[in-house]
């Protein structure tokens, strides 16, 4: 399976790198991320907007570089920039996003993980993250071992079934390696760098997290559901 179609695409393109399956046109492309957080943003405002909400974030480094319509991964959810200035930028989240993620409970002062979409010239240091959150999990426990922290997350059984030890999972948009898996949860080992540059360094036990399983695991899961009716979709 071809993941990227590079033919005819300049390596120096702006941040509009997308996940391709074979040959595609630009209008069919989708943003993709790596799960490597670039910055922590601060919620400036969260206000109702029709059936959804308008989220305004403050972050002085990324804001001047953004363009209208650009995709940004916010705590693991792919959102589109609808306004920005030198220090703030805004997104609009629909009812599906609010129902499937923890964005709906954000309040002014909360911190969020931010990552711009991947460019063709970038290194894939984490794993392919689409920004389409599969569901919510919750921090169950944190155990410190020196500078490292082993963290267990509770999650829906259908998501845990898509995880394997040494596989990848995105938690609040952070690419992590799975250590242990059980029927309704999984564990990871958080290194000092991850603890210092992402929200996972200060989120407390009981806090919700956005989860996205590995893209290839989704296709395997879908195939199994078609061949075995007992596998939930």
Where are each of the predicted segments found?
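Extreme N-terminal basic, low-complexity initiation segments
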Residues: 1-12
